[in-house]
Amino acid sequence: MDERRAYLAGGAEAVSADFESLAGTLEATGDFRVLRRFVPPSRYHEGDGSPTKTALVVDVETTGLDPVRDRIIEFCGVPFEYEPESGRILGVGPAESFLEDPGRPIPAEISRLTGITDAMVAGKTIDEAAVGRLVAGAGLVIAHNAGFDRPFVDRRLAAFKDKSWACSQKEVPWKALGVSSGALEFLLMKRCGLFFDGHRADADCHALIRLLQEPFDDGSLPFRHLLESARTPAWQVWALDAAFDKKDLLKQRRYRWSGGEGGRPKAWYRTMSVAEYESEKEWLKEAIYGGREGWRAERVDAKRRYVEEG
């Protein structure tokens, strides 16, 4: 039996080598790009003695887009160790993944997208104690669309209260550094030559960690850009009492509508960098308020960023 296993293993390695040879031949023509399946490693770099910290990548699958009405059906968190100065990721911990029964049928389009069915989640719940242990060791929580994930997570899991968050989709300058889209699957394909089965929380978490370690042409790491952004306070700008006919201008400028939940203003708002705010003030004055200053601006740090921005 051992000899047969060895024979089969050797055959598989030979087939794999043949496929790599074919892939290399195709790529050498310059007319083809070959995507390879992403297999998550447990380690990206060895430490060099520099200080390290722990971050946590999270992703949720939900019954819809509204954090008030919809529910989480899958949660995953993957911790990893990193060097805060260089942005190098060292070891990656095991994923903690949980399905949860939302107490209502999962919409058919969500099941088609995620593969998660009512039968899979029936009677299941997120282990809050396990999540609490996972979150306790992390100084930074990362999601690829934190404006979506954080409101769901904050409502469901008390362990995330007052944690610092960063958004790898918004806070890494993908377009400025030559990438036209911020979608996770596109980024992994375009930048790393890899594909994965997306729209399951654990796969998305591991794919994001891999993406954050792919250097840009200037040698900088996406994760270092993300860390620098997370450390820098931002402005949350509220276009209070903006005229109704200005809504399309504000939407084009990437403002979002707040319906007044949780004591927040009922107004259009946007979170932006300190540098962006300097030019935004002039635009608001001229385009929205007819030469006057009618907006409100608040400084926000990583603990307050993406709260209820779903």
Regions found by a protein language model. Give the residues of each.
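Acidic two-metal-ion nuclease catalytic site recognized across multiple nuclease folds
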Residues: 2-46, 214-310
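Conserved non-catalytic scaffold segment of RNase H-like nuclease domains
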Residues: 3-163, 170, 177-198, 291-294
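Residue-level marker of alpha-helix boundaries and capping positions
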Residues: 98, 175, 237-240
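Residue-level "edge-of-site" marker
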Residues: 124, 201, 263
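Short Asp/Glu-rich motifs
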Residues: 130, 207-208, 269
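Active-site catalytic microenvironments for nucleophilic, acid-base chemistry
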Residues: 156, 174, 190, 211-218
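Acidic, divalent-metal-coordinating active-site segment for phosphoryl/phosphodiester hydrolysis
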Residues: 203-211
